[in-house]
Regions:
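Active-site phosphate-binding strand-loop segment of PLP-dependent enzymes
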Residues: 69, 171-224
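Single conserved hydrophobic/aromatic residue that forms the stacking wall/gate
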Residues: 344-354
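Conserved PLP-dependent catalytic core of the aminotransferase class-I/II
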Residues: 206, 300-338, 342, 346
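Substrate-binding/gating loop at the entrance of the active-site cleft, primarily
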Residues: 128, 149-163
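N-terminal "arm"/small-domain region of PLP-dependent enzymes with the aminotransferase-like
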Residues: 1-10, 23-90, 220
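Active-site PLP attachment segment
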Residues: 236, 242-277
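Conserved N-terminal alpha-helix of the aminotransferase class I/II PLP-enzyme fold
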Residues: 81-128
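Conserved PLP-anchoring active-site segment centered on the Schiff-base-forming lysine
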Residues: 136-155
Length: 354
């Protein structure tokens, strides 16, 4: 008998069943996974993130490959203490949106420092990286605009594009991107090309210099989501733009504080005029409470460490290159990754479940 394997994709929104029916079907799937001992999601951790973690189902610590804390800054004493000191000074929360009173001086300081770090004029903060991408795109693009997107961009960006026109380009396909830019010229008010700096799905990089040239040639704006690049790429950790020597040549850079900074939150950095507009029209900022004082202070300290301690980035790359080398020696297919995002592709559904 042919075995049937299901994935989470099989239980996405379907118009054939109502919400309760879909939830019931999905619960049966989860029950089967648990019965088979294949629980892969929502696993309880009893420690913070690190190279090893203590999790449910294991009596001893296990080696961890699940976190994005690239530089280990979530566990540095300096970042912890900065957060503690901020709580003592400001309290546990801003308790208001930034636009109406939750805008602390350390929020302003972080905006200025992160904007300068990624080579932009100004920045706006968000409570999550997801909110940064989704919020700014909802604010900037409407029915008379179009987004030209790489198929591997983050889901958070896709969430912000539901009210505008979308055209998918091939992954790093410069020829097709140019073709589409020619086709849409003069048809839309705003043309925005959206790419990642480092693509987490397969670990490769965007062809940023060439894409910048195409955007300038065909008068399109460019948004770079550098969630996996900032803190990691470039001689000083300033991201994919620094790696390619393209700082200051990108219209909008977005990022998250949940990866190299070891915390939580997100930002967008752009020209002063664009940021001023977003501070009033990016709904995920305007209608969300500001980041907590602890989070903001810890991020500021993390940014300070990233600037002053290049050796932690060097160590990350040493570990990355060692793991890549050993995996290849053992015959694993890790694709075309050139970043700390290493992908292992297994040959069968059965292997993927192990």
């Amino acid at each position: 008998m042919k075995e049937t394997y299901y994935s989470l994709k099989d239980f996405e929104l379907s118009y054939e069943k109502n919400a309760i029916e879909r939830a019931n079907d999905f619960q049966q799937y989860i029950n089967q996974l648990n019965d088979f001992g294949c629980k892969s999601y929502w696993i309880t951790s009893y420690t913070g993130v690190g190279s090893t973690m203590t999790i449910e189902g294991f009596s001893e610590p296990v080696i961890s490959f699940i976190a994005n804390d690239y530089l280990g800054l979530s566990q540095r004493e300096e970042t912890k203490q900065a957060g503690i000191d901020a709580i003592k000074k400001y309290g546990t929360g801003a308790c208001a949106a930034q636009v109406i009173g939750g805008y602390l001086d350390i929020h302003q300081q972080l905006e200025q420092e992160i904007a300068s770090f990624v080579g932009q004029e100004e920045a706006i903060l968000f409570s999550s990286g997801f909110g940064a991408n989704a919020g700014i795109l909802r604010a900037l693009l409407g029915q008379n605009d179009i987004a030209l997107i790489d198929p591997y961009i983050h889901t958070s960006a896709m969430a912000g594009l539901k009210g505008t026109n979308i055209k998918r380009i091939g992954h790093n396909d410069l020829e097709y991107l140019e073709k589409v830019l020619k086709e849409v010229k003069g048809q839309y008010q705003t043309k925005l090309v959206i790419i990642d700096g480092v693509y987490s799905q397969d670990g490769d990089l965007s062809l940023l210099p060439e894409i910048i040239t195409l955007c300038k040639t065909y008068e399109a704006m460019l948004m770079l989501d550098d969630a996996h690049g900032i803190g990691v790429m470039g001689a000083n950790g300033r991201g994919t733009a620094e790696y390619y020597n393209c700082l200051g040549q990108i219209d909008i850079i977005t990022g998250t504080f949940s990866k190299s900074f070891g915390c939580v939150g997100g930002f967008a950095a752009a020209s002063k005029k664009i940021i001023q507009y977003l501070k009033f029209y990016a709904d995920s900022n305007v209608f969300s409470a500001a980041s907590t004082p602890q989070v903001t202070a810890s991020i500021l300290k993390a940014l300070e460490i990233i600037k002053k301690e290049p050796q932690i980035r060097t160590k990350l790359w040493e570990n990355t290159n060692y793991l890549r080398k050993r995996l290849k020696e053992e015959g694993f297919d890790i694709g075309k990754s050139v970043s700390p995002c290493l992908l292992y592709t297994s040959p069968s559904p059965r292997d993927r479940s192990v």
